[in-house]
Each structure stands twice: as structure tokens, then as C-alpha cells.
């Protein structure tokens, strides 16, 4: 398997992101990045990002959660952030992403979890608590849905799928500025830091495929 690993210097001095990186070996030889802030014995806020973002999305929420007495674990899905990026688009199945989060929860033995999820972090993350009920206590759900795979896809989703498939070299910084005009140029560039070339972006084309949506029927 050919795997991209974004150089560490791409993540140097990102605005508002002073957190130390942590890594978990998962899915064979692949390396998943996650943030781990706060007391290790505290209840956990497990923060799952969407696309095309990464754990940088939670940079302002992490200090607030820690100040409230929580341990914050914020992984980057494979293909995003500082996590490894397999070049083969077929790798990025729904189960691949879901299983990687389950493996991280088990490896860190996370308990008393509040699932904090947004966008695809919710579509993936919301299928997990019912299989691990003794580990989860609360949900904080933002801008997402619990997909069942049997409802017609919304116009917004179809528009995003068409857009992402037609823009293999998508300008992530410009996209984020359009979505959140208040972002500084440095913050917008930070969202784009993990993605160096076209093969880095195959993950979100796969995520929005009809096959992925149909997989949600199982849950």
C-alpha cells in the first residue's frame, strides 16, 4: 500500500494549535494522529471532525473542554490532518474509518465518553455508542445526522459530491474562507496544511460516494 505522510514542517506554528501530537498504529502499519489534552483520569470528550477539515477544527473548543475538567481526545481520520493518507481511494470505506475510531477507543481504554461530532464525524461516530454502551455517556452533535442510508440524498449533499468530484485539486483554504469568512488567512491555510497534492484528497471523494451512503443501512 502506498501511503502519504504529510511532513511535520507543514504543521509548524499553526495559529491557535499548540497541541502536542500523539500517534496510534492502526489498520496494520498505518499511523493515526490524535490530540490528547487534559488529565488522563478525567471524563473524555472524543472530538470527531468532518471533511475537508481535521482536528484543527477543535482548536478553540479543546481549551474550554479541558478547563471544564475533561480529557480531550481529537483524532484525525485517515486521509486527514497528521494521520497517514493511503493513496488508493478504495481504501477509504465507511468501515475503514469506523473501525479505526473503535480501535483508538479500545487502545486508549476511553471511558465516560462524551462524543463531540460534526459533519462526517457524526455520520461515522454516531454508529459507535450502541456497540460500546459502557464507554459512552453523552452526545454533543453539530451539523450532522444519524444516517440510515434509506432516505433520498439531500440537494446539498448531492451538490457537495458533484463539487468534490469535479475539483481533484480543491483549494481548501479558499473553501474554508468561503464557509467561514471570519477566518484569518493563516487559519484558512492551516486547514489546507495536510493536503499537498491530488492523491491527498481522494478520501473525501470516497466519503461522498453512493456506496458509502448505502453502507449506513446496516446501522
Could you tell me what each predicted segment is?
Residues 1-21, 32-39, 44, 57, ...:
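Flexible "cap/lid" subdomain of the alpha/beta-hydrolase fold that forms the substrate-access gate
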Residues 24:
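C-terminal active-site-capping segments
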Residues 27-31:
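Glycine-centered tight beta-turn/hairpin loop motif at sheet-sheet or coil-to-beta transitions
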Amino acid at each position: 500500500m502506498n501511503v502519504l505522510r504529510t511532513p511535520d514542517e507543514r504543521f509548524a506554528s499553526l495559529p491557535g494549535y499548540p497541541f502536542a501530537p500523539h500517534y496510534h498504529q492502526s489498520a496494520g502499519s498505518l499511523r493515526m494522529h490524535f490530540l490528547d489534552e487534559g488529565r488522563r483520569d478525567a471524563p473524555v470528550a472524543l472530538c470527531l471532525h468532518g471533511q475537508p477539515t481535521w482536528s484543527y477544527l477543535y482548536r478553540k473548543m479543546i481549551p474550554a473542554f479541558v478547563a471544564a475538567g475533561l480529557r480531550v481526545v481529537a483524532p484525525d481520520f485517515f486521509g486527514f490532518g497528521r494521520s497517514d493518507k493511503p493513496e488508493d481511494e478504495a481504501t477509504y470505506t465507511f468501515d475503514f474509518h469506523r473501525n479505526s475510531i473503535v480501535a483508538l477507543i479500545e487502545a486508549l481504554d476511553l471511558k465516560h465518553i462524551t462524543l463531540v461530532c460534526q459533519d462526517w464525524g457524526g455520520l461515522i461516530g454516531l454508529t459507535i455508542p450502541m456497540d460500546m454502551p459502557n464507554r459512552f455517556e453523552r452526545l454533543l452533535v453539530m451539523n450532522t445526522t444519524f444516517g440510515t442510508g434509506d432516505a433520498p440524498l439531500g440537494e446539498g449533499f448531492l451538490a457537495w459530491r458533484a463539487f468534490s468530484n469535479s475539483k481533484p485539486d480543491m483549494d481548501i483554504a479558499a473553501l474554508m474562507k468561503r464557509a467561514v469568512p471570519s477566518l484569518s488567512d493563516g487559519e484558512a491555510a492551516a486547514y489546507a496544511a495536510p493536503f499537498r497534492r491530488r492523491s491527498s484528497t481522494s478520501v473525501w471523494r470516497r466519503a461522498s460516494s453512493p456506496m458509502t451512503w448505502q453502507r449506513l443501512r446496516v446501522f
